[in-house]
Amino acid sequence: DLHFLIITKRIDRFSQCVPSDWGDGYDNVTICCTIENQKYADYRLPIYKDSAIKHKIIICEPLLEGIDLNPFKIGEWIDQVVAGGESGSQARVCDYNWVLNLQNTCLSENVSFWFKQTGALFFKDGKSYSIKRQFQHSQARKAGINIESGCE
């Protein structure tokens, strides 16, 4: 009854690191691939798509620019997309429009979407906000844009 989430930005090394009995993956393991910008989406997602993994989640965090997931037809192979801004004193801005674009792609592809956190610097409706760490998750939740569809 235990399910593991393994998060990596090194999906290009994944096939070299799996156990010999991995096959097409384990039922109780989800491998999550992080992407922070379009450059890394274009590099990592084709590798991720072709990897022998039963359950896949894309984590766009820290979200550093708008990312177009449409070319990857995520509805065919992704369980969920997670989006979130960067935390910490050196955090870079996260634009709410970038988050909404990801959410819209998930909506059209019937993929679950979770807006996890705003990040420390959040831009919405022409205004910049500095958000304390303790409120970043709750502020994202208040946006009310999470999508449950596509969940198994």
Which residues does each predicted region cover?
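Core AdoMet radical
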Residues: 1-17, 21-66, 78-94
